[in-house]
Amino acid sequence: MGKGFSAALPANAWNWIAVWRRNYLAWTKVALASILGNLADPMIYLFGLGTGLGMMVGRVEDASYPAFLAAGMVATSAMTASTFETIYATFPRMNEQRTWEAILHTQLTLGDIVLGELVWATTRAFLAGTAIAMVAVIAGYSAWSSVLYVLPVIALTGLAFASLAMIVTALAPSYHYFIFYQTLFLTPMLFLSGAVFPVTQLPSTFQHIAGILPLAHSIDLIRPGMLDRPAGDIALHIGALCIYAVVPFFLSMVLLRRRLLR
């Protein structure tokens, strides 16, 4: 078991680039539609809720509500972009398209494929999150210098959610099961993590739950940066996101290897 699992790990530090490049070249054919699709939901939240509720709510945590909301939408866009890329694009490459099967006939291992898929999903998250951050800057909700601070956090957020979604991909029998992950995990997390309103407005039990959610850790790093404020517990938040990125990666390797060997 241990020897077989070791053989499925990444063969070296660069093989994954071939998988990333393959996905990138395929994506360039639908890049515009893909980018617009990733931006639609966060933009609706940002300008719909930001403008509508902003007029009624006023200031939240010493910031205008649209500025408060913008940071949450940056993290949310990274979450959704990496998740959807991993479940809705990776799943067919593994199954009906049999792309993974073809790649496994080369010198690449299962680990190389999974790592390449995760880095590609992280790239998609980085583009989506950065685009929303730039929109927030243009709209006057944040400063240009703040974007530089949040870029690494956007990437780490994308990697964490891509790793989590890879577990879902490994377990799901078909596309129909992805809706459970979206409605039972992603959507509640959006409202529990402080993206739309402060976590402090939640009952204490839900505040404790929010403290372990990856999106909450991401927002707690991104929001202070975009609002030009000092962030607290930086090491804790980065460490939590790293755990969400690394542990699910190895767990998904076990699950995917078991699935492909059936």
From Swiss-Prot:
Its main location: membrane. It is a multi-pass membrane protein. Signal peptide: none annotated. The chain crosses the membrane at residues 30-50, 67-87, 125-145, 147-167, 177-197, 236-256. The keyword Membrane applies. It is found in: Cell inner membrane. The complex is composed of two ATP-binding proteins (NodI) and two transmembrane proteins (NodJ). This is Nodulation protein J. The gene is nodJ.
